[in-house]
A protein has these predicted regions:
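Flanking scaffold residues of small Cys/His-coordinated metal-binding clusters
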Residues: 2
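Cys/His/Pro-rich metal-binding microdomains
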Residues: 8
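Cys/His-coordinated zinc-binding microdomains
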Residues: 11
């Protein structure tokens, strides 16, 4: 028998055997990890990758994207990466990282807030996406109040009463309560799959379904960036409106 695991941040996965075995004595050295803040300005490799995804340099800078070399565990190599910053009062406290050559992911620090939340105009419609690239795609299309959840989607809707003090998976929602309460409408733009739909339902359940609209993506598209790349801005506008 074994237990399988999967990390939604770096996409590491595997299995651990449950068979009892004798473990050798291993000398352990304490290691301290620090969040890296000195990422590079956007380079050609990053800008080229973003352009293929429909994102301009102007939008990339507006949303604070950076470049950097980073070791990607799943690829077992150092790669050119795009860096998605998570900020608090203008200071980056964590970052999600994606290689631009291969589809590899990593994380620096622990994202705990909405991505792009500090660029939101309070009192306007708020667009909640499942991934950073989807939020950036909406910004590219003129929807400046687009944010992304910090964690991966939930697998299923869970019934029962919600206690904000114990709702750790959705703490980012409660931390942004003043912005959410002030928004005219909440447009939920999660992925078009079971997990994305469950995430959208859980978000709406916490905010209040009377204030939420859930986007339905066109056939053949699973998220906002997919629509932008395959069908263009006009189709994004049609879906969002």
């Amino acid at each position: 028998d074994s237990i399988v695991y999967n990390c939604w941040h770096c996409e590491a996965s595997g299995g651990v055997s449950l068979q009892e075995r004798q473990m050798p004595n291993v000398r352990r050295n304490k290691v301290t990890l620090a969040v890296k803040h000195d990422w590079d300005d956007l380079n050609e490799a990053t800008l080229s990758w973003l352009e293929k995804r429909g994102i301009s340099e102007e939008t990339a800078r507006e949303t604070g994207l950076k470049s950097g070399k980073h070791f990607i565990s799943a690829l077992q190599k150092q790669s050119d990466c795009v860096v998605f910053p998570y900020t608090n009062q203008g200071r980056m406290y964590a970052a999600k990282i994606r290689s631009v050559e291969d589809k590899g992911f990593s994380c620096n620090g622990s994202p705990a807030s909405f991505f792009n939340i500090e660029n939101v105009v309070i009192g306007e419609d708020l667009y909640i996406c499942e991934g950073e690239m989807d939020a950036i795609s909406l910004v590219q299309c003129g929807y400046e109040n687009a944010v992304s959840v910090p964690n991966g989607a939930v697998m299923k809707v869970v019934d029962g009463k919600i206690d904000p003090k114990e709702d750790n998976k959705f703490k980012f929602l409660w931390d942004a309560k003043n912005i959410i309460d002030a928004a005219k409408k909440i447009i939920i733009c999660t992925d078009d799959d079971g997990a994305g739909q469950a995430m959208g339902e859980e978000i709406a359940r916490r905010i209040g379904k009377d204030k939420c609209w859930i986007v339905e993506w066109p056939d053949g598209c699973k998220d906002a960036n997919d629509v932008l790349v395959k069908k263009g801005k006009k189709e994004v506008d049609k879906v969002i409106y």
